[in-house]
């Protein structure tokens, strides 16, 4: 009985913590997705090659993070929580996170217009 109580208490804490975490802009490791993009980039013998593609990808992701900082307050906590949860399952990308949040906000605004 005590173990059941402890498990229920732990679950309640985890449920309460998740929305709170969604209020902060996550620090995503974009290196894996950028390495993947760079590997698909131009042949190393071509001008720039994968090294340039990687650095441009990282720069682009940081620009998207800054866009997220500027727009963060326009998204609902549930939108943030859902979209951040999607980023934790695979290769994290601020570009994908911004896209998810913008689609969620657009859907909300369409529903409010009905």
Protein language model features and the residues they cover:
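Classic N-terminal secretory signal peptides
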Residues: 1-21
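Mitochondrial intermembrane space
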Residues: 18-114
